[in-house]
Regions:
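Transmembrane-helix motifs of polytopic, lipid-linked glycan transferases
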Residues: 18-19, 44, 72-78, 183-203, ...
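Membrane-interface transmembrane helices that cradle and orient dolichyl/undecaprenyl
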Residues: 201-202, 242-260, 294, 401
Length: 662
């Protein structure tokens, strides 16, 4: 509960800071929206403050606490405003609950929503288990904190990308640990749901608010990321607030709404690269709206300038950082156009082309049928979206009766969807348009009340079935985490016994130990010197390197070029390069006795043929090095000193002899 309390306190400080900033710029968002705008804006500013601290080598607990204290003092004058907004929001929720309760199907919907939220909330207290979170969203901040500095990590391919969410992870990991970072990201999801409910309720009543939230929770990929320390919740929250601002502007023509749209489009772009798609879609819709309103060219230019100025203020620093570090403002994407340090065509093929060959090919026919395929054949897009894409189809028959706001939501979603289809095609990256499509879905269900009650109830039943299926999915994901939540065992036992993963025995197909690297990494830490530096070598298999407590680089042939395997020809080349990098030890999951597996991409794909001599030279070099750990789990720790191989008995990492300690 200490972690949760810390997140709540920091959230309150962020909201106070956001309220102060909104008042300084004389921006007053409408109604309940002010609370969500302030909360999100405060966290966005926190991310920048952590970035500045890190760039100047100031990532220390005392520095972060000092920054939080100064932000609290800056916003303390807004305590009354915060209390007023919180009371208004609680009253609104109570009124909404009373309004919804008498309707049976809505009551069932409400119960299912509450159960999904409860199960996910409990799961968020467990140690993090998601591979993407451990090896990216937490691993990069952990390396930053080891040196107290934010620097370019050339073997971490996303370390130069926009990193607002990971800055917030760094803040909490510095003070308390990764669970507090996970809880912070989880609460961004709650803020997203509350903001979606409030926004929809203000226009279509409490029933509309509940239906919109239910539509979002029908997204199967949502429950997979809701309780993980990833950036999906934050970027979607920023995107929703940017859309909210655009809708407010369409009704008021206030320049302050355009400023807010620019701020949150910039924050979305500063959280994840696909936030640029959110910004492009918003500004495209803005131009269309101004043309429909017959604005003069001078007024169009002025309005665009306001939005773009605030967008640039909050987005540009991340892309400038990427350009200065790598030579590519959107590193490592669009290598053919921008190039990029420590990147090459082989890596670009592996990361951005090979993986997408299994996606749905780009064609007009596939574009038309893709909403149906996302729902029914989600494996093409790595996840299913739920029913909201199909639930909006009846809106085609109501087009003449659609409100201006619904049309704007539809235009925004359509433009972003087109960008997504041509450049991304991963269902997880549709998150920014799921709230708008959920609002459209809620609107259509409510409008069908007088036109086709049968169709309305069919849509309601579809949503209930979607919620029920996602509740089962959520239970499957979260229940295995509960031992880590309720402390029925140690962290070591939790990671040893955790089984809900994609790691399966190739013979039996059964789930196997999810995190053997945990014990291996703990034992490796006992054997290393304070000035040791690791290189992690692996081929095609997943390797959870987050658990290492020592500085490391990734010597992954198909994921980085700091150790350029295409230029290595023999043992001497390999040893020389590792000495240049200061590497003292190698951790690997490759069995030298078996060599390179015949199924490895290095062997089977001709694009990787230039890497093969270097990989063989690397493995040859390891055969003449000392083995410190040979674990039954298939992991090895080599020391790059001397040339005599030490034969150790086959042991599990937890049983490695303590005599090997230095």
């Amino acid at each position: 509960m200490i972690s949760f309390s810390l997140v709540i306190v920091c959230g309150a400080v962020a909201t106070l800071l956001g309220l102060r900033l909104l008042s300084l710029f004389r921006i007053s968002p409408e109604g309940e929206g002010r609370l969500f705008y302030a909360y999100a804006l405060g966290w966005g500013v926190f991310a920048y403050l952590v970035l500045v601290l890190g760039l100047f080598g100031g990532l220390y607990p005392v520095s972060v606490i000092l920054i939080l204290t100064l932000c609290f003092l800056l916003g303390i004058g807004k305590l009354k405003t915060l209390g007023k907004d919180l009371r208004a929001f609680v009253i609104s929720l109570r009124e909404g609950a009373r309004e919804v309760l008498p309707v049976p199907l809505l009551l069932v919907t409400k119960i299912l929503v509450a159960l999904i939220l409860l199960v996910s909330f409990v799961g968020a207290f467990a140690p993090p288990t998601n591979m993407d979170a451990l090896n990216y969203h937490l691993a990069v901040p952990k390396l930053y904190l080891q040196t107290h500095t934010i620097i370019f990590l050339p073997t971490m391919l996303y370390s130069a990308t926009p990193f607002a969410s990971e800055m917030i992870n760094s803040l909490f990991m510095l003070i308390k640990g990764e669970v507090s970072a996970q809880l912070a990201q989880h609460l961004f999801g709650w803020a997203l749901l509350f903001a979606l409910f409030s926004f929809t309720k203000s226009r279509y009543g409490s029933r509309g608010g509940l239906l919109a939230v239910a539509g979002l929770l029908c997204l199967s990929s949502f429950v997979f990321v809701f309780s993980e320390p990833k950036n999906d919740m934050l970027v979607t929250l920023f995107s929703l607030l940017a859309v909210w601002s655009l809708l407010s502007w369409s009704n008021s023509d206030r320049q302050s709404d355009l400023a807010l749209m620019g701020v949150f489009a910039g924050l979305a772009s500063g959280t994840k690269l696909f936030g640029l798609g959110v910004a492009f879609s918003l500004f495209a819709v803005l131009v269309v709206l101004m043309l429909l309103k017959r604005y003069r060219l001078s007024k169009i230019s002025m309005s665009l300038s306001v939005g773009l100025a605030f967008f640039s203020l909050f987005a540009f620093p991340w892309y400038l950082k990427s350009y200065l570090w790598s030579g590519n403002p959107v590193y490592p994407f669009f290598y053919g156009l921008f190039g990029g340090n420590h990147w090459n065509g082989i890596l670009d093929y592996r990361v951005f082309q090979l993986g997408r060959e299994s996606y749905l090919p780009v064609s007009f026919v596939n574009l038309i049928i893709s909403p149906w395929l996302i729902v029914n054949r989600g494996e093409i897009f790595l996840a299913r979206t739920g029913v909201v894409f199909l639930a909006i189809l009846p809106g085609v028959f109501l087009f003449k009766r659609l409100s201006q706001e619904i049309k704007i939501l539809g235009w925004f979603s359509l433009i972003y969807y087109l960008l997504w289809f041509f450049f991304l095609r991963d269902a997880r990256y549709l998150m920014p348009i799921i709230p708008p499509t959920a609002i459209i879905c809620a609107f259509i269900i409510l409008r069908l009340e007088a036109r086709s009650k049968l169709l309305k109830w069919l849509l309601m039943l579809t949503i209930i079935l979607g919620l029920g299926a996602n509740l089962l999915t959520d239970l499957k994901v979260q229940l295995p985490k509960f031992p880590g939540v309720f402390g029925t065992g140690s962290e070591e036992e939790f990671y040893r016994d955790f089984r809900e993963t994609e790691r399966r025995d190739h013979t039996s197909g059964k789930l196997v130990e999810a995190f053997p690297e945990y014990e291996f990494s703990r034992k490796a830490s006992e054997l290393l010197f304070p000035d040791s530096k690791l290189a992690v070598f692996s081929l095609d298999q997943a390797f959870y390197y987050y658990f290492f407590d020592y500085p490391y680089i990734l010597a992954l042939p198909m994921r980085q070029s700091l150790v350029d395997f295409a230029s290595l020809r023999n043992d001497e080349d390999v040893s020389k390069r590792l000495r240049e990098l200061g590497i003292t030890h190698i951790a690997t999951d490759v069995d030298l006795g078996g060599g390179i597996p015949d199924s490895s991409l290095v062997v089977t794909d001709s694009h990787f043929a230039p890497l093969l001599p270097g990989v063989n030279a690397f493995l040859s070099m390891l055969k003449n090095r000392s083995i410190l750990i040979h674990a039954e789990d298939g992991f090895y720790l080599y020391e790059l000193v001397g040339s005599v191989q030490i034969e150790l008995p086959l042991v599990r990492t937890r049983d490695c002899p303590s005599a090997l300690r230095r």
